[in-house]
Swiss-Prot record:
Stored InterPro entries: Adenyl_kin_sub (IPR006259), Adenylat/UMP-CMP_kin (IPR000850), Adenylat_kinase_CS (IPR033690), Adenylate_kinase_lid-dom (IPR007862), P-loop_NTPase (IPR027417)
Function: Catalyzes the reversible transfer of the terminal phosphate group between ATP and AMP. Plays an important role in cellular energy homeostasis and in adenine nucleotide metabolism.
Pathway: Purine metabolism; AMP biosynthesis via salvage pathway; AMP from ADP: step 1/1
Name the record gives this protein: Adenylate kinase
Native source organism of the sequence: Vibrio parahaemolyticus serotype O3:K6 (strain RIMD 2210633)
Alphabetized UniProt keyword annotations: ATP-binding, Cytoplasm, Kinase, Nucleotide biosynthesis, Nucleotide-binding, Transferase
């Protein structure tokens, strides 16, 4: 089962990725993790990536695609894998196709921008421990205070409205065209495209996914 997850930042991809991994026993392939592992291991591609990063540049699609090819050839990907955060652009999707990587399911989590802004704006974090809360969905016992230490909670810069809206802008510009791309692939019978309402409760979305993948 080879799956690609699509959805804006804050649409709940990470939560459902964990559910899919546990349920179907397939690894999540994160390009960030792969890059770090390749650099640490000192592989040929890792060395190339490190040189680019050290020069303050973006790692090319070619290097990322090479890393993905190496990663999915490993034993734990025999039953499939879950790609999260890749592809982000049409050229990357074309690159996967040219490499002969078949995709069984493309899963989109659909959430309106305003809902995402509200979700992110409600997040509160206790920075020393990494514990996170939400003023509506997962409030602390005492408003504005960490449950364990009683220390102040803060709004991370990443969760501030202007930052969230900027990230959503990039997503719509770069990644949203993939929705159309994979819609056409599905129409041609090359993959299955599944769209879920990301505003539902987490357990409901998980149940919907399980039913669709059965």
């Amino acid at each position: 089962m080879r799956i690609i997850l699509l959805g804006a930042p804050g649409a709940g991809k990470g939560t459902q990725a964990n559910f899919i991994m546990d349920k179907y026993g397939i690894p999540q392939i994160s390009t960030g993790d792969m890059l770090r592992a390749a650099i640490k291991a000192g592989t040929e591609l890792g060395k190339q990536a490190k040189a680019v990063i050290d020069a303050g540049q973006l790692v090319s699609d070619e290097i990322i695609l090479g890393l993905i090819k190496e990663r999915i050839a490993q034993d734990d990907c025999e039953k499939g894998f879950l790609l999260d955060g890749f592809p982000r652009t049409i050229p990357q999707a074309d690159g996967l196709k040219e490499m002969g990587v078949e995709v069984d399911y493309v899963i989109e989590f659909d959430v309106a921008d305003d809902v995402i802004v509200e979700r992110m704006a409600g997040r509160r974090a206790h920075l020393p421990s990494g514990r996170t809360y939400h003023v509506v969905y997962n409030p602390p016992k005492v408003e504005g205070k960490d449950d364990v230490t009683g220390e102040d909670l803060v709004v991370r810069d990443d969760d501030k409205e202007e930052t969230v809206r900027a990230r959503l802008g990039v997503y719509h510009e770069q990644t949203a065209p993939l929705i159309d791309y994979y819609g056409k692939e599905a129409a041609a019978g090359k993959t299955k495209y599944l769209k879920f309402d990301g505003t539902k409760q987490v357990a409901e979305v998980s149940a919907d996914i399980e039913k669709a993948l059965a």
